[in-house]
């Protein structure tokens, strides 16, 4: 940022570190904050509070201010654990209201090319949770990417010997979409995963 103050240049530099925020977007955000100075203090306070108060649940590794989180300390079905990659995935499932069990957040997915191994994820903690005998089913809800599929396969191989039912989220054609616009792999999975009516 040529000819701007050092403070503004630093702000733009910090904003650019956020995912999906490039130079232009960072400048736009910085100038918006300058136009509305009352927002600066509120934003700064929110950022500080998140840094001080928000942490990972010691049971499921979701983001929380309380430990254990409200899901782990609530009246949810403790016999079913849904494994997700990131806390955002847990929120998506909760919005659907389709799952009433508990969660386990891996904090990522296996990615040998990026140096992410099982030791980098919360897999050991998941396996420890499964030792108690209370869990009947593990629903693997990793993303349908190469990394997510590899993680699902790896987890299945670890969990199956424990005589715990392992299921995977169904995937197929999104509601409201036309078949002609759906990729071949999605159509294939939808056909293979068809159910009887």
From Swiss-Prot:
Question: What range(s) does the Toprim domain occupy?
Answer: 79-174
Protein role: May play a role in DNA repair. It seems to be involved in an RecBC-independent recombinational process of DNA repair. It may act with RecF and RecO.
Query: Which UniProt keywords are listed?
Result: DNA damage, DNA recombination, DNA repair, Metal-binding, Zinc, Zinc-finger
* Zn-finger region bounds: C4-type: 57-72
Which Gene Ontology MF annotations are present? DNA binding; zinc ion binding
Q: Please provide the Gene Ontology terms (biological process) for this protein.
A: DNA recombination; DNA repair
Q: Which CDD domains match?
A: TOPRIM_recR
Pfam entry (one): Toprim_4
Q: What InterPro entries does its record include?
A: DNA_Rcmb_RecR, Hlx-hairpin-Hlx_DNA-bd_motif, Rcmb_RecR, Rcmb_RecR_Znf, TOPRIM_dom, TOPRIM_RecR
* Protein name, as recorded: Recombination protein RecR
Q: Which domain of life is it from?
A: Bacteria
Asked if DNA repair is a keyword of the record, the answer is: yes
Please verify whether the record's keywords include Ribonucleoprotein. no
**Region forming the signal peptide:** none
The family this protein is said to belong to? Belongs to the RecR family.
């Amino acid at each position: 940022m040529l000819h701007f103050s050092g403070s503004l240049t630093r702000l733009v530099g910090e904003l650019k570190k956020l995912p999906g925020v490039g130079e232009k977007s960072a400048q736009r955000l910085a100038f918006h904050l300058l136009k509305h100075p009352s927002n600066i203090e509120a934003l700064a306070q929110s950022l500080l509070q998140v840094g001080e108060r928000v942490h990972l649940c010691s049971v499921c590794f979701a983001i929380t201010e309380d430990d254990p989180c409200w899901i782990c300390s609530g009246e949810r079905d403790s016999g079913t654990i849904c494994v997700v990659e990131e806390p955002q995935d847990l929120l998506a499932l909760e919005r659907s209201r389709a799952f009433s069990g508990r969660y386990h957040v891996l904090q990522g997915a296996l990615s040998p090319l990026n140096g992410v191994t099982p030791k980098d994820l919360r897999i050991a903690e998941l396996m420890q949770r499964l030792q108690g005998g209370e869990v009947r089913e593990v629903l693997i809800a990793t993303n349908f990417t190469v990394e997510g599929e590899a993680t699902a396969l790896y987890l299945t191989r670890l969990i199956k010997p424990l005589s715990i039912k392992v299921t995977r989220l169904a995937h197929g054609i999104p509601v409201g979409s036309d078949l002609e616009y759906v990729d071949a792999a999605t159509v294939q999975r939808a056909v293979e995963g068809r159910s009887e009516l």
